[in-house]
Amino acid sequence: MASKNREIIKLKSSESSDMYWTVKNKRKTTGRLELKKYDRKLRRHVIFKEAK
């Protein structure tokens, strides 16, 4: 289980409707998360942004 410092977030692709779920430390990462990950629908790496 995640502790109270961490929050489960959704990462949404900037180019398609693909999504990832991950955990973020709220104390260390106060801004919105932005990662480059593999998009399974487009079959290439794109930027995924944190969505609420």
UniProtKB/Swiss-Prot annotation:
Residue ranges of coiled coil: none
User: Which domain of life does this protein belong to?
Assistant: Bacteria
One Pfam family hit: Ribosomal_L33
Q: Which InterPro entries match?
A: Ribosomal_bL33, Ribosomal_bL33_CS, Ribosomal_bL33_sf, Ribosomal_zn-bd
Q: What keyword terms does UniProt attach to this protein?
A: Ribonucleoprotein, Ribosomal protein
Annotated GO biological processes are: translation
> Record's Gene Ontology CC terms?
cytosolic large ribosomal subunit
Q: Which SUPFAM superfamilies match?
A: Zn-binding ribosomal proteins (SSF57829)
PROSITE patterns according to UniProt: RIBOSOMAL_L33 (PS00582)
Q: Name one GO molecular function term.
A: structural constituent of ribosome
Family per similarity comment: Belongs to the bacterial ribosomal protein bL33 family.
Entry-linked HAMAP family? Ribosomal_bL33
Q: What is this protein called?
A: Large ribosomal subunit protein bL33
